[in-house]
Amino acid sequence: PNLDIRPWGWDVALRKRLSGLGMDEALLPSMEQLDGLREYSHRSKAVSLLPELQLNEYFCGESYYLKTQEEWKTFVEERECCLLKAPLSGSGKGLNWCKGIFTPFISGWCTRVAASQGGIIAEPMYNKVEDFAMEFYSDGTGEVTFMGYSLFHTGKSGMYEGNRLLSNEAIWKQLSQYVPSKVLTDLENCLKYRLSALVGTVYKGYLGVDMMICRFPENEK
């Protein structure tokens, strides 16, 4: 039978497991392809993409890819609180919350992560109202399709805890309480275009873009 394997992300461990279960090697990505996916999964790609998504006054978000001890220290000490992320991590793992002091522990953590992953992702803190994501499917030939929304929740540490099982329409209505629906549609269309250019021909499968609805005191948006 014709099989099309569609996991939520590939890595060496999954490839090894499927191969061990007798899966045809022709259906599995090569090690070279996995290396390419690792490159495109690096958070520095999101750092580069983020400025292109600032479509109007409803959008916020800053993210920096920092590579040196001096940059890490300056970023942490210039802010009352901030978040450092390992570039190759997800689901709320590989996070380090900082409160204005670049401690020896944080310094050591940054050094170890940068040695294996090239640098550190640094972001300011926001007053989060909702966690959500837009989900897409890339066909590998340049076409990226919007598949729907995901509304999820995380713990105090930022680690993923679970999803709310709602229809796309219900999630859309929930998010539209905070921002105009056109803002969501415009972002969806922008992401389809940007993701097609970025990964449309190098990746076949699902991908998601995590987002937040944030509140700012000056306008309560």
What residues fall within each predicted segment?
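Well-ordered, non-membrane alpha-helical segments in soluble/globular domains
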Residues: 1, 43-51, 69, 102-108, ...
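A short acidic (Asp/Glu
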Residues: 14-22, 93-96, 132-133, 216-220
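Short secondary-structure junctions
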Residues: 55-56, 80, 116-117, 199-203
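ATP-grasp fold ATP-binding core
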Residues: 60-66, 75-97, 111-128
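Glycine-rich phosphate-binding loop of ATP-grasp-fold ATP-dependent ligases
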Residues: 62-63, 82-107, 133, 156-175
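Phosphate-binding site of ATP-dependent enzymes
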Residues: 80, 103-161, 208, 212-221
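A long amphipathic alpha-helix within ATP-dependent nucleotide-binding catalytic cores
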Residues: 158-220
